[in-house]
Curated annotation (Swiss-Prot):
One Pfam family per UniProt: Abhydrolase_1
Transmembrane residue ranges: none
Function: Involved in pyrimidine catabolism. May facilitate the hydrolysis of carbamate, a reaction that can also occur spontaneously.
GO terms for MF: hydrolase activity, acting on carbon-nitrogen (but not peptide) bonds, in linear amides
Top-level EC class as recorded in UniProt: hydrolase
Organism: Azorhizobium caulinodans (strain ATCC 43989 / DSM 5975 / JCM 20966 / LMG 6465 / NBRC 14845 / NCIMB 13405 / ORS 571)
Name listed for the protein in its UniProt record: Putative carbamate hydrolase RutD
All copies of domain AB hydrolase-1, residue ranges: 21-123
Recorded catalytic activity of this chain's protein: carbamate + 2 H(+) = NH4(+) + CO2
UniProt-listed Enzyme Commission number(s): 3.5.1.-
The keyword Cell inner membrane appears for this protein: no
Presence of keyword Transmembrane helix: no
InterPro entries reported for this sequence: AB_hydrolase, AB_hydrolase_1, AB_hydrolase_fold, Pyrimidine_utilisation_RutD
């Protein structure tokens, strides 16, 4: 298994396909597996790079609190290890924030930026959601935290129709949970992030992808991002909730491939 070395945590990564590189960065869970519904479609046209965030999955676990700046450096290390100078960067929620930080720190490495259900700063609603998740984790433990997660991520009908799939995923997530303190550290880092004053400094082509029925990160937060980032565009779907890339992968894949294709022309 390939790893990016050189920092305080070895970072597991995967490469699929060939072509102009696309680096995918997951959200709160941090695992490369979040992007499984994207691999086949994207790898037919691009070199697809996935990785586990530091402290999660198969990456090094022995880390303390990690800033967004450090997470962006991790992202750059993965590109270095893969031998990639620049890539389209797509991040889900927190992964998008990390991509935004890389676009600010090293714009020459980001061909384009796609932020899926992201935000510039956690507002009162989003903070309440994260605080509830923290309390579930602290009061009831990792299993309850994991079992509550679909309620934040997926549409009710999709949950009802995919109970067996969710139960299988939950068993894996509990077995490989990053640890309570690591997850709490990640939540605190994301709540502390405030990128509002630097949005105008983002100079790479940017797409804000959002789901109108996202009950965790409302789509108006993507609208605010689009208003602050020069020449950014927003693409919204009606249904799919926070994890619409998994719920309606064909829709998301077409959206991302179309955007990257325009940039590569």
């Amino acid at each position: 298994m390939p790893y990016a070395h050189g920092g305080d945590a070895d970072l597991y990564y995967e490469i699929h396909g060939a072509g102009t590189p696309i680096l995918l960065s997951a959200g709160m869970g941090g695992g490369a597996g979040f992007w499984r519904p994207q691999i086949e479609a994207l790898a037919a046209r691009h070199q697809v790079i996935l990785y586990d965030h530091a402290g999660t999955g198969r990456s090094g676990r022995d880390i303390g609190p990690r800033s967004i700046t450090e997470m962006a450096r991790d992202m750059a290390r993965v590109l270095d290890a893969a031998g990639v100078e620049d890539a389209h960067v797509a991040g889900h929620a927190i992964g998008g924030i990390i991509g935004m930080e890389l676009a600010l720190a090293a714009p020459e490495r980001v061909r384009s930026l796609t932020i899926v259900n992201g935000w510039a700063r956690a507002d009162g609603f989003l903070r309440r959601c994260f605080e509830v998740r923290k309390r579930i984790l602290l009061a009831s433990g990792p299993e309850a935290y994991v079992r509550a997660q679909p309620l934040f991520l997926y549409p009710p009908r999709w949950i009802a129709e995919n109970i067996a799939v969710l139960e299988e995923e939950e068993a894996q997530m509990v077995a490989h949970f990053p640890g309570t303190q690591t997850m709490l550290n990640r939540i605190e880092t994301f709540l502390a992030f405030d990128g509002r004053e630097r949005l105008a400094d983002i100079r790479v082509p940017t797409l804000l992808a959002a789901a109108k029925d996202d009950a965790l990160v409302p789509s108006y937060l993507s609208t605010l991002l689009a208003e602050g980032i020069p020449d950014a565009r927003i693409a919204e779907v009606d249904w799919g909730a926070h994890a619409f890339s998994a719920v309606t992968p064909d829709v998301f894949n077409e959206m991302l491939l179309g955007f990257c294709g325009e940039i590569d022309q």
